[in-house]
Amino acid sequence: MKTIRQWVGGEYYEGSPLGVIPVENSATGEVTAELLQASKEDLDHTVEVARDAQKEWANYSLSKRVAIMFKMRQLVLDHQDEMARLIVEEHGKNYSDAIGEIQRGRETLDFATAINVALKGEYSHDVSTGVDIHTTRQPVGVVAGICPFNFPAMVPMWMHPLAVATGNAFILKPASPTPSASLLTAELYKEAGLPDGVFNVLSGDRRSVQDILVHSGIDAISFVGSTPVAHIVQDTGVSHGKRVHALGGANNHAIVMPDSDLDFAAQHISASAFGAAGERCMALPVVVAVGGCGPQVAEKVKKYAEAIKVGEGMGEGVEMGPVISAKAKDRIVGLIDDAEKRGSKVVLDGRGLTVPGYENGHFLGPTVLDDVPLDAPVYTEEVFGPVLAIVHADTYEEALKIVNAQPFGNGSAIFTNDGGVARRFTLDVEAGMVGVNVPIPTPVAFYSFGGWKESLLGDTHIHGPEGVTFYTRAKAITERWPTEKTYAATMSFQREE
């Protein structure tokens, strides 16, 4: 059986592992590899290597860094088929979705190739006689990125291109079920010419995360995952003197107004709710149907959803793969069962789906629930599966209250042909990313990504301009170069008369 090791200092590294973690093929249920679990000693060694490498890397000119990022961008493009196949094998998502996440992740590499522009400082001439001020941004040092299983390529690429391009060293802690895309990324960075030790991959379980959070040699932490863990990351990291941004969970809502094109809305809702088997923080698990249009929306979504081909990710025409594990499947089925007991109408039931030849895989079909009570766990919790819950509201105002009452604020959308209502929604909804007739309002990489409320802990969003801010520290430099005319020193603030 294949053994998956760490990547430290530009090479594969075995170290002194605590044990192994099984890596499973979600479509077959079979264990395909054993992942070495890093020890505290492995982390200490990795941090030491990263700190030494960062000192050299920070002194590379911006032009040299940009050249390496350009090479890396091209290498990711050249190897996207290989990377996508690794993702399909471990995560289970269909091949086209795996290619799609790599392409979206590569957008951050695109942005990183212009880091010489993003790092331009500010300058003021003669703020006082003969005194100039300018600002510069310098790397924070060693950054750790802690990533979830659902996007093994894209979410790490939200982090490491900007962290590396701004002069930091990076330690990537991938999710244990999906480590291989991160290791291929490490190989590509080496081929691109990145100095050894600047990019490292260290795998493990929650003990590895805890070790990262308290390690004195790590200066900043980027995290994407569930909200309960995000709170731990934020609280522990900050209390140990680290810069932290922690992106938590989501329960994204879309309001469907009765004036909207319901066929258009249903088609996009289906793709957004069931793409990637619903295992994404920008999935659309909840629709708030206004003015009695709920049953129509449910039936129209059903028409599109029941046509989705579910199967093994490399299968021809497959549009949706399995969920990540048997445990995840059981939890999702339990939420559907509970919703049915509470009176929800099961418009489309995916609980009994099996895929011929993959009976041990963790498959569920798309499920559409209508008239879901607001106290049902399938509504209140982050489902992270192929389930759409439709709730009802009489008016736009009632629908907005429902959307804003939830603790999450990642992404929200509205379907309407009324520009006035749409504008009100964009201003009034409590979410960090908002779509008008766009169900997954994920911004491109030169904007920043992140939510509000329980969906984001910390002060900065990820990638884009806020990403550059997070991975750097500002320094204001005040200069005076005396000439023949000298200035007397005083004990007070210098000022012009």
Go through each PLM region and give its residues.
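Rossmann-like NAD(P) dinucleotide-binding subdomain of oxidoreductase/dehydrogenase enzymes
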Residues: G121-F264, A393, G458
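Short, well-ordered beta-strand elements within core beta-sheets of diverse protein domains
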Residues: T32-A38, D52-N59, G145, A254-M257, ...
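Residue-level signal for inorganic ion chemistry
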Residues: G29, R65, I87, L109, ...
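Structural signal for hydrophobic packing residues in well-ordered secondary-structure cores
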Residues: Q54, A58, R73-Q80, A84, ...
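Residues at or immediately preceding the N-termini of alpha-helices
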Residues: S26, K40-L43, L62, Y95, ...
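Conserved C-terminal structural/oligomerization subdomain of aldehyde/semialdehyde dehydrogenase
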Residues: T28-E34, I218, I255, E306-K309, ...
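ALDH superfamily catalytic-core signature
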Residues: A220, P228-P373, V436, K485-Y487, ...
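N-terminal Rossmann-like NAD(P)+-binding subdomain of aldehyde/semialdehyde dehydrogenases
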Residues: M1-V131, I324
